[in-house]
Structure formats: structure tokens, C-alpha cells
Amino acid sequence: MLRTFQRTLTKCQTPSLAIRKQCFRRQFANARSTKYMGRSGSSLRYGPWLTASALIATSLCFYDGTVQNDEKNDGSLPYNESVQVDSSVSDFPLTITALNFPVSTNFKLLGYGQRHVTFLRFKVYALGLYLAVNDEDLIANTFNEAYLHKYFLDVDDSKTFKQNLARFLKRDDPKSVMMIDDLLDSGMRMLAKITPVRNTDFKHLKEGLVKTISKHPDVANNKETLENGLEELNKAFSRNGSVRKNDDLIIELLANGALQFSYHDNKNNEFEVMGLVNNQLVGKFLFSQYLSGDKSPSPQAKKTAIDKLITLM
């Protein structure tokens, strides 16, 4: 088996297979017994030898051809690159893919920042906001010249389209919230990675999400529907216990507006899919708060995400 691994590694060292090599090396490093929660309430354990055998098959598959997925595999994705969001936790990857996280598609980092509790003046968690790679076109499809002139009377014709767009998105008024809500209504998939910078628990994480959602300006107009959605959130987030510093809460906004929650035990490199919230308002209001308004949990993450979003037009 060792010789087989050596032969496979030799094949993967071909320059044209650089991306596949990175994937194989990452998988090889995780060849110890791991736990992956394939669906809520179920778990799978793989012994080292079974995992090693699977890795050989995976490496050969990568050598002979690209892995088939529900989306095209963008070879330009910098799988091994990252950015420091907070010095007390691991760097955030520039991309999150189904190869290393329990997600449905490839995501790339849009913005990042920290969540502070103002009155206590301490940091709570690091936040990364990711956009589905294949959904970039939805930005330009939603925000165009006709859109701006339809909803805004103060379009400055002396400025470029991007300059006007940036001005409207950064104003922190009801119309900037409306713009982000329209973008989310297009079916754009997003992901939030929350990494505590101090030990906490699932209860506090859930309460933080509920508070963020409840601050959306349209809550009063959707009270009954949102109450049902928060009930769903409570059931999907039913896990109790502590969450260590540097663990990850992964929140994926699906194309149909549902939210998928996953937990990453960073110390043991184990993933658990916690649950699904089908109520569309919950996901929409959560990510709308991340990207707009004056009550975003991380103004820094909002600013960097909006700046990046504009460059993608």
C-alpha cells in the first residue's frame, strides 16, 4: 500500500496537476480516522486503512480526469490560499469547496471582519462571507442601469455606473437594504463562516443569529411568517454544549432560500450537518443584515463584502 501511495504521489507531482496535488495532499493529511456527519442524526467513521484505500482511488480519479460535481470545477480556485481575519484563530480560506467542507458548491471569499460586543468592548467571533462562484452573474443581472434609474431619483449622470452603485449600497438606508434583498431574491447562494475567538456554546451562537435576524427592518411586516421560521431555526439548531475557540459554524444559503447549518470541530477535523431551515425569510434576513443596513453584526465584513461585490460587476 505504501508503494501504491508513492506511485500515486509521483503522478500527482506533474505541474499540470497542481490543483489536484493540493487536494490529494490535504486529503492524505486527514487520513486518520475521522467523522463526517452526512445528514442530521447520522455519522460515519472510517478506519485509517479504509480511508487510505479511498484516497488512492480518489488520487487516481484526479489523475485520470476531473471530478464531476453539480457545478463546473473552476481550476483557478486558490484552494491553499487564506487570509487572516483575527490573529487568535486560524486563517480563513479564500475558497470553500465540497472537497473540504459539507457544502453544495464552490464558494469564494467576498468579505470578512470581526463581531464586537460594543458595550463590553471585546471580540466575539471572526466572520467570513462567501459567494457561490457560479452565481457572480446574478449581481450584474440584478444591478444594472435600468434598475438604478427605476428605484433612485438621485442617480448622478456625471459618475460611472459602479460609482453610483457603490454610493447607493453604502448609504445604510432602507433602499440599500432593498437592493441587497433584491439580490438575495435572485437565488444567489452565499455562505457565512463564523469562528469564535473565545470559548462559547451553541446557545449563545443561536441567540446571536436570532438577534441579527430580528433587527431586519421588514420584521414588523412579516411577523407571523418569521416567527414560524425562527421556530424552525430553533429545531435545526438543537445541539447543546460548548463550542471551542477556533471551531467553525458554517451557514449555507441555498438557491431556494433555505439555510443549511454545519459545525466544524477544528481540533479533531470533524464535521456535523446540524439541520436545515426551509423558511426563506430566515436566510434572507440573516444575509441581508450581514450585507446592508446600520445594524450589521460586523460593519467591517459588510464593507469589504460590498467593495468586492462592486468589483465583480
Q: What function would you assign to each model-found segment?
A:
Residues 238, 244-265:
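Short tryptophan-centered beta-strand motifs in secreted/extracellular beta-sheet-rich domains
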Residues 262-276:
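Short, compositionally biased
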